[in-house]
């Protein structure tokens, strides 16, 4: 989610103090005390996720305090990852734990992978006994497997390494995200048939993009629409190529285009192409993903009817609670509590927020209440 955020320091490691209650099991028989911060109620608050968190907190409250030092290693500490940092730090504080949220200074390539591995290795060797990581690629697997082999619970967040020994993945399930977005677009289209263009990815070589696109495609086809996928061009000249291809597809489509959706953060390209082809929001229903400034502009103008946002805050917020649950309750007992959002034994789906254009300001107020943003 690329939007204007409250100023955040680029901190490679923000450490929160450890309270007396987290220094191992209490010989007096005292139970673990957890006090969640009060967040203003909102229609956008994911009630089912909140129920799961509250269930986990209740069960944790029946146990004696345990010693846990949480290392959370992200890819970056800005923009998209900032809500994860804020969520993780809030949960660490509520649990009265020692914890650190870190990230490499490099954002891609071998250097970033090596730096992320070095952070994990350093933190594990210094005594952290719970690990969460948003891995770049398979090159991040050795520290994850080493931690698991040492009986340290490991969670992957936002991006997964299914072939590793991690205990759980917390994040968006792209196939389900695509289905949700497809359902949103169906609800926005007034026609019962016609062509729908997806600016997405139709090559299984990138599983996340492919799964999201195919999830939406399946829902739309089942609803009776003819679906055309334009594989988005991510090169330096990609925007011009996408705009030309989309405008041509709109002009040439038979049956006519009644809906469009961008599956990634460049979704605004659909709106630009529709304008180029002389179409309005009354002609074509357009839905999007994420909050690029141009996407927001088109939502305010009425050309984009809705967007979808991943729940990075909850990815970060849930992670320390789940790691603590693994330690205090056991992994299977914790996963049983998480069952409403588990898609299988090792993946937890945080879901999507659906934001109609008419409720954009209300959504920004909700983000402000979480401490992760201010309105555009």
Residue positions per predicted region:
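C-terminal motif of bacterial Sec signal peptides marking the signal peptidase cleavage site
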Residues: 17-20
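Bacterial signal peptide processing site
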Residues: 22-25
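Hinge/cleft segment of the Venus flytrap/periplasmic-binding protein
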Residues: 29-66, 220-223, 318-376
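Extracytoplasmic "Venus flytrap"
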Residues: 39-63, 67-87, 91, 95, ...
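Hydrophobic alpha-helical segments within soluble ligand-binding/sensing domains
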Residues: 48, 52-57, 116, 170-196, ...
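An alpha-beta-alpha
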Residues: 70, 74, 88, 180-232, ...
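Hydrophobic alpha-helical
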Residues: 121, 130-149, 216, 234-298
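Flexible loop/hinge segments that line or gate small-molecule binding clefts
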Residues: 138-176, 292-300, 304-305
């Amino acid at each position: 989610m690329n939007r204007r955020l409250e100023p955040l320091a680029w901190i490679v490691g923000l450490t929160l103090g450890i309270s007396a209650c987290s220094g191992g099991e209490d010989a007096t028989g005292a139970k673990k005390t957890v006090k969640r911060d009060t967040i203003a109620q909102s229609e956008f608050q994911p009630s089912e996720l909140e129920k799961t968190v509250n269930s986990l907190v209740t069960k944790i409250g029946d146990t004696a305090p345990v010693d846990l030092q949480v290392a959370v290693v992200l890819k970056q500490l800005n923009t998209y990852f900032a809500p994860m940092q804020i969520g993780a730090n809030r949960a660490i504080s509520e649990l009265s734990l020692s914890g650190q949220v870190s990230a490499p200074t490099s954002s891609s390539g071998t250097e970033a992978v090596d730096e992320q591995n070095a952070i994990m290795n350093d933190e594990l060797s210094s005594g952290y006994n719970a690990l969460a990581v948003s891995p770049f690629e398979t090159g991040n697997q050795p520290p994850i497997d080493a931690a698991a082999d040492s009986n340290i619970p490991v969670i992957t967040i936002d991006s997964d390494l299914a072939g590793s020994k991690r205990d759980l993945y917390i994040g968006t399930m792209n196939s389900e995200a695509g289905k949700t977005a497809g359902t949103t677009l169906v609800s926005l289209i007034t026609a019962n048939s016609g062509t729908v263009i997806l600016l997405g990815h139709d090559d299984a070589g990138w599983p996340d993009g492919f799964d999201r696109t195919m999830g939406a495609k399946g829902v739309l086809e089942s609803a009776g629409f003819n679906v055309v996928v334009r594989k988005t061009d991510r090169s330096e000249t990609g925007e011009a190529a996408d705009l030309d291809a989309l405008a041509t597809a709109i002009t040439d489509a038979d049956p006519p285009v009644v809906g469009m959706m961008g599956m990634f953060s460049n979704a605004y390209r659909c709106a630009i192409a529709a304008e180029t082809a002389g179409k309005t929001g009354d002609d074509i229903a357009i839905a999007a993903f994420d909050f690029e400034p141009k996407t927001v502009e088109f939502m305010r103008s009425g050309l984009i009817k809705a967007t979808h946002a991943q729940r990075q805050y909850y990815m970060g917020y849930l992670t320390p609670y789940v790691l603590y649950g693994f330690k205090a309750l056991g992994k299977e007992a914790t996963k049983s509590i998480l069952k409403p959002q588990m898609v299988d034994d090792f993946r937890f789906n945080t879901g999507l927020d659906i934001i109609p254009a008419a409720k954009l300001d209300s959504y920004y107020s909700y983000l402000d209440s979480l401490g992760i943003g201010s309105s555009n």
